[in-house]
């Protein structure tokens, strides 16, 4: 999985490789996660003229901090036309999208969700109390994430009965592992983590169900 965040060229025999349907990309702030996700979208879209990718993101954030393109990529390439940006403001919008996923006549080859965890920050910025006055904001957030991931998981499993489709989402994590790891592991088989490696360099490690790969990259200008 790690190489698909960097290369736009499909690897030889790539169609025969086992790919998990859901992948999480977790790393610290300003580690190039959005750029890696967009590079992944380019990789999928470049593999075939029939491939389409839906890139779900916050409009203001993507416009103020657009993803970087790797060297050698032609910004005027037709492949960009096969990547559709879908602007979503809250977690309900993500659930509505996947609830209607089975109605799509032309299913995308991949769905990418940038800053997935940020769609649930409203639960941490407001105080939600139960009948006894106990703070319930963290629990409400966890339940909303579970509902969203479950809906996404079921939608992708159903879609793969018709054609190959996968979901890759990212989250910002200041520590060594995703903040909601116990939730993600229930629904997502492959978790790719990013760690700083000094001087603007980062180490990306992908842990799948049967393999582990790593890659080093830099976003220093």
Segment roles from a protein language model:
Residues 1-221:
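N-terminal regions of ATP-driven nucleic-acid and macromolecular assemblies
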């Amino acid at each position: 999985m790690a190489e698909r965040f960097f290369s736009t060229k499909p690897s030889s025999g790539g169609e025969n490789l086992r790919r998990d349907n859901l992948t999480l990309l977790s790393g610290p702030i300003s580690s190039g996660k959005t750029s890696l996700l967009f590079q992944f979208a380019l990789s999928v879209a470049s593999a075939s003229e029939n491939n389409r990718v839906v890139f779900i993101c916050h409009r203001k954030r993507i416009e103020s901090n657009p993803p970087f393109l790797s060297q050698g990529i032609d910004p005027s390439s037709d492949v960009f036309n096969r990547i559709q940006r879908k602007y979503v403001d809250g977690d309900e919008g993500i659930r509505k999208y996947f609830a209607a996923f089975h109605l799509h006549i032309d299913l995308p080859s991949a769905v990418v969700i940038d800053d997935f965890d940020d769609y649930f920050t409203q639960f941490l910025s407001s105080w939600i109390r139960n009948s006894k006055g106990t703070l319930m904001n963290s629990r409400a957030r966890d339940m909303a994430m579970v509902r969203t991931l479950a809906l996404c998981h079921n939608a992708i499993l159903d879609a793969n009965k018709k054609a190959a489709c996968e979901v890759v989402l990212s989250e910002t994590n200041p520590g060594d592992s995703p903040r909601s790891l116990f939730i993600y592991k229930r629904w997502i088989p492959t978790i790719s983590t990013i760690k700083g490696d000094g001087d603007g360099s980062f180490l990306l490690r992908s842990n799948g169900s049967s393999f582990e790969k790593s890659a080093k990259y830099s976003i220093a200008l």
